[in-house]
Amino acid sequence: SDVYELPKILDQKFDIVYTSYGTIGWLPDLEKWAEVISHFLKPGGKFIFVEFHPFVWMYDDDFTHLKYSYFNEMPIVEIEEGTYANQSADLVQNYVMWNHPTSDVINSLLSQNLVLKSFDEYSWSPYACFRHNSEFEKGKYRIPQLGSKVPHVFSLVAEKL
């Protein structure tokens, strides 16, 4: 469904809005995304967000070379076999994603009168979602060739004025 349309069908305000891994890469417009978040937050409400760092989306699937821009210059279009839920499904399809730099994420939220309370970056992911991940500590995974040199995930908390 179209998250941008949610304010047209849901008429509630919340103390917390939470968005997690793998969400904004499917969205072309973070300004509209931030409008939706602000729309549903009560004054003083908190937006909690955790996402893969845009740095990791710059690489090819095997993390051997940079393939895409860090900046949202154009949609990323790839051909994928299978589906998100079933990689062995007999299906070939194009999918479109966008790589949003962290500055775009933060600035879109600030433009909607949300105040940034915290921002953190992590050199690991809490689960093995990329090819060739290795668990270096219980519940912490890294892309071996990147190690702890680059961020894998980031999180933030923002509060609505």
Regions found by a protein language model. Name each.
Residues 46-83:
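Conserved class I S-adenosyl-L-methionine
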Residues 112-114, 139-161:
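Core SAM-dependent methyltransferase catalytic element
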Residues 95-119:
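Short alpha-helix
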Residues 31-46:
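A short glycine-rich, Lys/Arg-flanked "PGG" loop and its adjoining helix->strand segment in the class I
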Residues 15-31:
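A short SAM/SAH-binding and catalytic strip from SAM-dependent methyltransferases
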Residues 54-62, 89-104:
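Acceptor-substrate binding/catalytic loop of class I
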Residues 4-17:
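A short acidic, Gly/Pro-enriched loop at the edge of an enzyme's catalytic core
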